[in-house]
Amino acid sequence: MINIWTEKYRPKRLDDVIGEDENINTLKSFVKNGDLPHLIFAGPAGTGKTSTAIALTIELFGDDWKENFLELNASDERGIDIIRNNIKDFAKIRPSNKLGFKIIFLDEADQLTNEAQAALRRTMEMFYSTTRFIFSCNYSSKIIPPIQSRCVVLRFRPLDKEAMERKLREIAKNEKFDIDDDSLDAIYEISDGDMRKAINVMQAIQSTGEIKPSKIYEISGEINKNEYKNLISLSLNGAFSDAKSLLDKMLVDYGLSGIDIIRGMHSAIRNERIANRQKLEILIALAEFEFRISQGGSDNVQMDALLARISYIGSEIT
């Protein structure tokens, strides 16, 4: 039976959570006091929101944590029924633990409709004596103000390179295989601070027995950031035919969408040494053509036009 590494290496205690010292210290103070407010965990995917919620529950309830923890995903059941049924059924049963409350963890809470959130706000008030809510979301701004005002908001950030690579080395050592710096750099670039994605990529590459950057990009369906830099550079310097060939390779051989490529270009251009005005115009163009594609424009037509725009920027703007 294959162990899923993201579960195998999920933090079991708050001290095991990496890269979120301020948030962890705040949660430890709640544990020490034996009480908990409603919480909002806000941040991108893979930043440890679910793992932190589980570690917090284990700290509070010990071996009985599963009896006192309900995890639901709002994106699976977006309507108001999730509030009336699953949550109310769990909340109305009085807890048997000494703290006197249970925890409901609602993942992707920003996917709930406003109507469902309003119903949830009433449920929070009705069952506060027995239930605490932890809302996990990408954007706290999508949680209605009446819920936000009843919660402590903790913001989770993508893991920095040093912390991620330290954890990946620890996993590699435990799994008894070697991984070099270049491969770790490739995993970090692909995951962009998402620890869950990084661990999944490393497990996938370890299973192939071929641990090297090129294989990492291949198995993850990603390409090296330098390819995006080359695409921008070729276009900017007027080598339109070469840029078009590279674009076709990305679209056909790598199977990337136009929006994938635009977002890769956006990430790549941030630290490029390009004249400020040129960089400004390119960023505006990236936003414009991403919008065009999102509204139904053809990937091929719009991406060709984007390269032409960047070529124009290179020739006319200094």
Swiss-Prot record:
GO cellular component labels: DNA replication factor C complex
GO MF annotation, one: DNA binding
Entry keyword ATP-binding: yes
InterPro entries reported for this sequence: AAA+_ATPase, ATPase_AAA_core, DNA_pol3_clamp-load_cplx_C, DNA_Rep/Repair_Clamp_Loader, P-loop_NTPase, Rep_factor-C_ssu_arc, Rep_factorC_C, RFC_lid
Binding residue positions for ATP: G43, P44, A45, G46, T47, G48, K49, T50
UniProt xrefs under Pfam families: AAA, RCF1-5-like_lid, Rep_fac_C
Keyword check for Nucleotide-binding: yes
Any single biological process term in GO: DNA repair
Keywords: ATP-binding, DNA replication, Nucleotide-binding
Subunit organization: Heteromultimer composed of small subunits (RfcS) and large subunits (RfcL).
Similarity comment: family membership: Belongs to the activator 1 small subunits family. RfcS subfamily.
PANTHER family for this protein: REPLICATION FACTOR C / DNA POLYMERASE III GAMMA-TAU SUBUNIT (PTHR11669), REPLICATION FACTOR C SUBUNIT 4 (PTHR11669:SF20)
Function of the molecule: Part of the RFC clamp loader complex which loads the PCNA sliding clamp onto DNA.
Protein name: Replication factor C small subunit
